[in-house]
């Protein structure tokens, strides 16, 4: 018996637990993709799998629905793999361990993968059922969504017949998403020169931050652990502390607000009173600025030994400090048309350093193409002023809100019949594959919805069990709707 075997709807949670048992972080979805292909073959369904691992499964209409317009069910196979500092799992190789915690499903020390495993579970449960009426279905399951919507960008959709698409990649029940931001990934490369230096290696860890999804939670005022390193280095400089930078790390994914970062410095005399004073100033300032959104923020200093180290020379260390201090992050502009909607933002998601260079990795989002280009230009200009270079990749278009949508009207009508209330219709500041599919499939009508998922992209992620059940009933009602 599985951990989730007593939950309803049983078929949905059965497949969700199956998905959890198969590692499927971005770029490592092959096993889950193969599982879906074997599922299709076992059920006698037409299926194709491309070289990337994207999967298309086709199911014929049930009796009485042969003349209804076909529907596309769409979600992504990959998940963001994040974990607590003490979690021993390798999420590229190890299974997720789901647990039931009251009215929620969560995971032990890791992200749950409800984004977007719940969509895959819904789709497989529909295809497996014998008692769910529906028109002809095309199930599209993509890879590498979380790292720039790469699977959808590469997938061939020329054989899709449906023009009505249900994207199940939203995280709030009662909300129908009808538009989203476009995005781009940016890598800023700063060359470094190293030189021998003698002193005490001191590691500074910034931790205790909440983190979160860089699209749907970027407006919540949470601190960025990587950007705070620039503040820390600047306070050291202002307190007259000489240092040489030795190592840098922070964050896990470009689209996750980093909750931890560290920098190792070589200090002439270790943790002196001046260093402690800078640490006290840093903690006080950060708590004053971010205490409401990030009450657990903390700085920990640890001496790691004395000796001679191959650290950054003074010029490289200063350019790194300036980059960490000056690179923009967070909300850049709010929409003038939609109250409360973020228009443009960027997330400094990953920092790393090797022997030759420091690399800062960003995720840019905007519903205005020119604003995305301007922010890209700013990052490029600042990086070049600091002697570095940039690489752009993972570009994807915005999904523009349609004034008229027959599918949206259907979903609203079904929602009102089931819930006795009107759904909220929104555009969001996050990337959805609807933008890519709309650009590739002429005349495509899209809507996105899903159950309540909390704290996605973090080890605190949890899925609301009752909401999963209600949205399952909602999905079945949409499938059974006759035009």
Model regions: which residues?
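Acidic/His- and Gly-rich active-site-bordering loop/insert found
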Residues: 2-104
């Amino acid at each position: 018996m599985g951990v989730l075997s007593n939950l309803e709807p049983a078929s949905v949670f059965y497949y969700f637990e199956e998905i959890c048992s198969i590692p499927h972080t971005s770029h490592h979805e092959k096993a889950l993709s193969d599982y879906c292909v074997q599922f299709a073959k076992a059920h006698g369904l037409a299926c194709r799998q491309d070289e990337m691992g994207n999967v298309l499964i086709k199911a014929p209409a049930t009796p009485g629905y042969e003349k209804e317009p076909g529907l596309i069910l769409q979600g992504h196979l990959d998940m963001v793999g994040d974990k607590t500092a003490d979690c021993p799992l390798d999420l590229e190789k190890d299974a997720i361990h789901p647990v039931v915690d009251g009215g929620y499903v969560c995971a032990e020390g890791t992200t749950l993968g409800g984004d977007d495993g719940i969509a895959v579970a819904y789709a497989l449960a529909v295809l497996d059922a014998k008692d769910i009426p529906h028109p002809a279905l095309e199930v599209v399951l993509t890879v590498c969504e979380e790292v720039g919507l790469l699977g959808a960008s590469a997938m061939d959709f020329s054989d899709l017949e449906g023009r009505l698409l249900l994207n199940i990649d939203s995280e709030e029940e009662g909300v129908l998403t009808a538009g989203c931001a476009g995005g781009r990934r940016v890598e800023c490369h700063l060359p470094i020169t190293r030189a021998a230096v003698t002193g005490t290696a001191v590691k500074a860890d910034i931790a205790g931050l909440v983190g979160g999804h860089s699209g749907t939670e970027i407006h919540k005022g949470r601190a960025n652990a990587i950007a705070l390193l620039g503040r820390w280095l600047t306070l050291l400089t202002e307190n007259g502390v000489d240092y040489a930078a030795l190592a840098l790390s922070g964050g896990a994914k470009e689209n996750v607000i980093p909750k931890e970062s560290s920098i190792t410095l070589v200090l002439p005399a270790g943790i002196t009173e001046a260093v402690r004073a800078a640490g006290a100033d840093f903690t006080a300032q950060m708590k004053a600025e971010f205490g409401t959104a990030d009450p657990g923020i903390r700085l920990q200093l640890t001496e790691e030994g004395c000796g001679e180290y191959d650290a950054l020379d003074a010029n490289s260390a200063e350019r790194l400090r300036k980059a960490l201090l000056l690179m923009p992050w967070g909300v850049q502009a709010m929409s003038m048309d939609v109250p409360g909607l973020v228009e443009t933002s960027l997330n400094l998601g990953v920092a790393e350093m090797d022997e030759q260079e420091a690399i800062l990795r960003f995720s840019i989002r905007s519903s205005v193409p020119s604003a995305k280009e301007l922010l890209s230009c700013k990052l490029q200009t600042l990086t070049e002023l600091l002697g570095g270079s940039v690489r752009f990749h993972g570009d994807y278009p915005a999904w523009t809100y349609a004034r008229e949508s027959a599918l949206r009207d259907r979903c609203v009508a079904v929602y009102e019949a089931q819930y006795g209330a009107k759904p909220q219709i929104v555009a969001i500041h996050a990337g959805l594959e609807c933008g890519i599919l709309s650009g590739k499939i002429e005349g495509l009508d899209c809507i996105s919805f899903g159950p309540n998922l909390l704290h996605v992209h973090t080890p605190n992620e949890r899925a609301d069990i009752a909401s999963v059940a209600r949205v399952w009933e909602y999905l079945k009602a949409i499938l059974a709707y006759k035009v």
